[in-house]
Amino acid sequence: MRGPDAEQEDTLDANVVHKLVREIEAKDASTAAHTWRVVLYLRAMLEERGVRGEDLMLATHGAALHDVGKLDIPAEILQKPGRLTDEEFEVIEQHTVTGYARMIALDVDEDIILDLVRYHHEKMDGSGYPFHLNGEEIPRIARDFAVIDTFDALTSHRPYRHEVGHDAGDKAIAMLVEGKGPKYDPQSVDLFAELYRNGKLDYILNYFNDGAELPGYGSVDDEELTRSIRV
């Protein structure tokens, strides 16, 4: 049973999430729209599976904080416009490790959050980072998120990208399907592709893909966030 301070504790936890996300957005402006999208994509997948309540909210927090380790990456590397050197990419790879350490330092012990932060760049064939895990060694939530993160990277607005909206989305889904098994969890790909083809992700792909039109995820309070994720 929850004690009398449970509601206040939840509010404090949410405040920590928003504070950290605001710090990430301040360091890397492109993060704001990305955070909205990956949170909403993950919620769509989990709700389709019937996940509700606390687990859904924890997953939302984990998705919002998945890149918290980037706070420890030097700005000249994080915001570098050109190709990263091998040494610079090794620094980037450490953001999952430092992000996990930040969560532990905050006494976060929920596996959903920790697994998202630590393992979201792992791939089914062991080619991911930082631990090169294989298959079911990777927690389910991180396997889901790998699909989402890849889709978002391939469909987010970029000055050099000619395809946007469904043109980009169709290509991204085709690539994920091609990588199903070797790179991406088949169940995760199938579910995400079904949601996409049924139009259930359209509002995220379209409305939430214009960072200039969105408030930073970390600047929205819980009540407004709840309204936003129910559109």
Per-region residue spans from a language model:
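Metal-dependent catalytic cores of enzymes that make or break cyclic nucleotides
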Residues: 7, 11-231
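Juxtamembrane or sensor-core-proximal signal-transducing alpha helices
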Residues: 1-4
